[in-house]
Amino acid sequence: MLRFIQLLPQVSPKGDFILKDLPGSGKRIDILCRDLAACFSWGPITWLKASLELIAIIADTTILTFRHPGDEIPQNEVGWALVIRNSLREQPPEWVSVSNGSVEEIIKMYSNPPESTLWVLDEKGSHVSEIETKLHITQNSFMLGNHKGFNSQTEELIAKYKLPRVSLGKKSYLSSHCVASIISEFERSENVE
Ligand SMILES: C[S@@+](CC[C@H](N)C(=O)[O-])C[C@H]1O[C@@H](n2cnc3c(N)ncnc32)[C@H](O)[C@@H]1O
């Protein structure tokens, strides 16, 4: 299982955004729509989609956990936005679960090295090629910031739990690009073995 954790501290947990204005009314909910498309639609080539999970932490109060939608896969950004909106309005499809929770609770759940490692995706971390050997001896989760990166509360948690930082290079990429790159990194290393 490969897991992505997208932090969205500014998004409202009420699901009250307008479909025609996702970045503005949704306070950058478009980031999550693109992550989901990268994770379950165009990102994986050989990696089993059933072995992917994407968690969105909304406003540090609400957790949406997305698994492979199968035949119900949304076809575009608005389709994903509808799924997110319905889930936040207590009408999730079977492949989305909704719960209460915070960034710290999710960190405690998935950062249990050496069995389970929570990596922070950060331009300034160790390059992914340097940690490649470690990736195969642990269950991996990758945490992503929003368009502004990580806020000060999250930075404090990253320091408190000593979360390792991993980089895809010095350039700042869209989080959807990071999701797809991590999946291809795993696909590539599986093919090498
Ligand atoms: C659009 S970027 C945020 C850019 C923001 N200017 C910043 O300073 O963090 C969204 C998230 O994608 C991830 N990210 C972007 N580029 C990356 C890279 N080169 N390596 C690792 N993670 C990256 C980080 O988690 C980042 O918080």
Q: Whereabouts are the PLM-identified features?
A:
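RNA substrate-binding interface of SAM-dependent RNA methyltransferases
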Residues: 2-123
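Glycine-rich loops and low-complexity Gly/Arg-rich segments
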Residues: 29-32, 79-82, 146, 167-170, ...
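Structured adenosyl-cofactor binding patch, chiefly the S-adenosyl-L-methionine
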Residues: 153-193
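Short, low-complexity, polar/charged sequence segments that are solvent-exposed and flexible
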Residues: 23-27, 73-76, 137-140, 162, ...
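Active-site cofactor/cluster-binding pocket
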Residues: 100-143, 149-157
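Short, amphipathic alpha-helical segments
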Residues: 30, 144-152, 172-176
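Short, exposed beta-strand "edge-strand" segments with a Pro/Gly-rich flavor and a Y/T-containing core
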Residues: 96-101, 148, 161, 171-173
